[in-house]
Design a protein with these regions (language model features):
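Intrinsically disordered, low-complexity segments enriched in small/polar residues
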Residues: 1-9, 19-132
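Short solvent-exposed strand-capping/beta-turn motif centered on an Asx-Ser/Thr pair
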Residues: 11-15
Length: 132
């Protein structure tokens, strides 16, 4: 997979932005399994843009009871200028929550992502996260 230098950040409990790394298309912050996994992708060519959101887990099983509710997502440019904000719905989809600009759609986590050329800084603040 090619990500062309994307940088993604999530604020930790202290409010400090923590850079996330890619792994099989997913990001994991160790060691806390309750930390949120966020996959942000944009596929140039078909206009698909979305956010794939779930709790951290080494496997996709055993996460059904660990939903996060995300109310707002803010995209920032590299200089931290706000680009756009989205208000997200919450959908119970077997532990897999996905928001796209047009509609909900199910994607396999092994989705091959090609031609990703933009660089974003992605923040989710503590107040945007809440457990059910």
């Amino acid at each position: 997979m090619n990500y062309y230098g994307y940088d993604f950040y999530i604020r930790n409990d202290s409010g400090v932005p923590v850079k996330m790394d890619w792994g099989l298309g997913l990001k994991r912050i160790e060691p806390d399994d309750s930390v949120l996994l966020v996959q942000v992708w944009e596929v140039i060519g078909n206009g698909v843009r979305g956010f794939d959101v779930m709790p951290d887990s080494k496997y996709w099983s055993n996460i059904d009871s660990q939903y996060y509710r995300i109310n707002k997502v803010s995209l920032y440019s590299e200089d931290e200028s706000l680009i756009r904000e989205w208000t997200l719905e919450t959908k119970d989809d077997g532990g897999h929550q996905l928001f796209s600009e047009e509609h909900w759609k199910r994607y396999d986590y092994k989705l091959k992502i090609e031609s990703v050329i933009r660089k974003w800084i992605f923040y989710i603040t503590d107040e945007d996260l809440s457990l059910p």
